């Protein structure tokens, strides 16, 4: 099942579970149903808000990020770090919502680099969303449950942040090579974060 479909299904299932648990709690006032409602509600929050964030940023950015911005630049220490944790060995085993975005046969290195920037931002926002879930502990208590679920969700998103920055570190030499080639041959012009003649 595609990751996007999993997110939609998980959002729907957790919402239904939340509605059932809340109803049963109001009818019986059993504490177990309150616990189930909080669990289902937290799950719904993590899945649904991530789904909305991903769709929104995809619509707004449309894979046209400015790769020259400081936030997207790969720092000198990152290459050694990614090598040490073996990103190359496990990144292809992780799910991808839109694999067609990462096809070098269909897109230029610049376009792929822009995709990695957009994906990185989505997952970084998701990390903040995970932290936001801790606010649920204020009215409901159960801080350990909120903390552990937020920590797990945030760490999961950070894996994808690392992946996208690693991918971009591999793509940037290709982008620069294409930029130099375009400048020498006159087949394209460089304007902002786009290379003319590649679209």
Which sequence ranges carry the predicted segments?
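Cytosolic-side membrane-entry/anchor segment at the start of a transmembrane helix
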Residues: 1-39, 162-175
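Residue-level signal for alpha-helical transmembrane segments in multi-pass membrane proteins
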Residues: 21-25, 49-52, 129-136, 140, ...
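Hydrophobic core segments of alpha-helical transmembrane domains in multi-pass membrane proteins
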Residues: 34-43, 133, 145-154
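Membrane-proximal soluble regions of multi-pass membrane proteins
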Residues: 55-112, 169, 177-197
């Amino acid at each position: 099942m595609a990751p996007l479909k999993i997110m939609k299904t998980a959002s729907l299932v957790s919402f239904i579970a939340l509605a059932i648990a809340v109803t049963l709690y109001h009818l019986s006032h059993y504490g177990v149903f309150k616990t189930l409602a909080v669990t289902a509600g937290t799950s719904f929050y993590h899945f649904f808000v991530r789904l909305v964030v991903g769709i929104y940023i995809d619509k707004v950015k449309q894979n046209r990020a400015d790769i020259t911005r400081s936030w997207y630049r790969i720092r000198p220490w990152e290459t050694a770090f990614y090598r040490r944790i073996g990103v190359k060995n496990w990144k292809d085993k992780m799910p991808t919502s839109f694999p067609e975005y990462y096809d070098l046969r269909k897109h230029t290195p610049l376009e792929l680099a822009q995709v990695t920037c957009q994906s990185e931002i989505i997952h970084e926002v998701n990390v903040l969303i995970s932290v936001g879930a801790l606010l649920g502990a204020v009215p409901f208590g159960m801080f350990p449950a909120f903390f552990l679920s937020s920590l797990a969700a945030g760490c999961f998103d950070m894996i994808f942040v690392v992946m996208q920055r690693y991918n971009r570190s591999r793509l940037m030499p290709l982008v620069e090579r294409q930029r130099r080639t375009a400048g020498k041959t006159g087949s394209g012009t460089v304007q902002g974060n786009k290379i003319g003649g590649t679209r």
